[in-house]
Curated annotation (Swiss-Prot):
InterPro entries from the UniProt entry: Zinc_finger/UBP_domain, Znf_C2H2_jaz, Znf_C2H2_type
GO biological processes: mitochondrial RNA processing; mRNA processing; post-transcriptional regulation of gene expression; regulation of transcription by RNA polymerase II; RNA processing
Keywords: Metal-binding, Mitochondrion, mRNA processing, Repeat, Transit peptide, Zinc, Zinc-finger
Identification of the protein by name: REH2-associated factor 1
Annotated source species: Trypanosoma brucei brucei (strain 927/4 GUTat10.1)
Amino acid sequence: MRRWLVASMAPQLHQLLQPVRRCHHPLRIPSVQLAAPRSHTHEDIAYASCPACSRVVHMCDMLTHLITAHRELDQTHCRKMCTERLALYERVIGVPLKKSELTSSGRRVLDFLPTVLPTGYMCNWCDRRSDVYATRDKFLKHVADVHTDIDLEEVEPHVPLPPRGVVVEKSNGDGGPQPTRRLNGVVAVAEKSEPINAVPRILGISLPRGVDRPLKATAQFSDTEFPCELCNRTFNSEIDLLQHLETRHPDGTAEGPAGVDSAAIADVAQFSAKEATTGGDQRVHVICDLCVSSSKVYKMPSALFSHIRFKHPNEDAAFHVERLIREQKTVSSFVCTVCQKAFASAAALDGHFNSKHAEQGEAQNVVGRVTANNCWWCHDCEKGFSSAKGLHGHMQNKHGLSSQTHPCPACKRVFADIYSLEEHLSLQHKTIRLSDIGLLTHVKCSTCERFFLSHEDLHRHAVKHHKKDPRAPAQPFEAPTSASHVAASTSAAVPSEVEATASPQGPRKVKKRKKTTEVSEVTS
């Protein structure tokens, strides 16, 4: 009975096992896909999670990671996914993605160690992984010769040793390696490899900003914009302009309009390098008087040198930079208290403040009404405090004011600041005052009724907001005359009784006055 059932079911079992026998090739999974980026930004497009292990990998290294760590995936499908994502990055950002970027782990070298095969080592740092090195020493020699940017001493301890029991036999026979089994009707075809013609990459800024937009040659620039004289791009600050000149036009070989003098570019680069080494922190407020109608204020000598070198090529740029800085050193400038931009006139500053910082007008109005909550003023950040101790702590935390201990002259107790000492004296030693020991707690501005911690802060405040002469001393000298001198000078014309009623607080020199009257009677 059993034999009859097996014989009857044999054709059905043969049909079921036939598809399985045909699947002699290894399993490939082409259905994996990269997750769509959350937004079209550099961070979200340049990095992606591996669809197999969820590891965040840089897109320039994603293909290498997929075909080395997940060999069960289809290489053609993986290459197509990576190519589409790189094309999306170039279409959105505007430039190809650089391969010099590191992976998320920051150790790109150790993330792609060589693959150990039965026949040797395969280098994963090469773009084309077709060569296999038979020994570990040959692989390390390849790394030292080809990949010079990789530290060999750092990589060598992590390169694994060849597995035990693997012996590479060298045969001197005429025939090469032959397959052990062939199917009927199958003809062996030699493998052909076509070289890949890689498109040369265009090196540039990986993250172009909105302010770096190209403009027409006839465009008109406002006083708050800083254009590049070579490619007509505009920037919002001089620092951005200088960085653009150093990166895009360093030696005259970068892209630029026809007719640009390469010597001028070299002079600008040399002047900027000299300024960075000798006086890179110098800040000035200079207007170019060579231009007929120009009200742009230059705050860096290198930016002024670049303007004169390109706009006025027949002039000596270095001489005029030194001359303008020397002549306009004492000229008062108009600087915005919010964004620190300089302007040539008060009207230009008011227009900028009303258009750019209208909402912060009340908060930044220095000459406004003084209240008890903001009478203690910080000149650096234009902010008021309700107490001197709060202003002192702000100056220490934000502006690096040096801390100094103050001992009590009576009980020798040490305090961290002068205001704690003043509070201690008012409670424990009421007969001692800070003025008796020569300590100053604050100074007051006579114009706006604000308090400052030192005469230097008051001087800078008065120069900036009350048109004080910057050459004037920060601390005024004491008057040579006093109340006693005034009273003595007016004693001859005013009787003693009237003088006593007019100035009861003045000192009375009765003995000296009597002596002078007696001497006058004797002489008469």
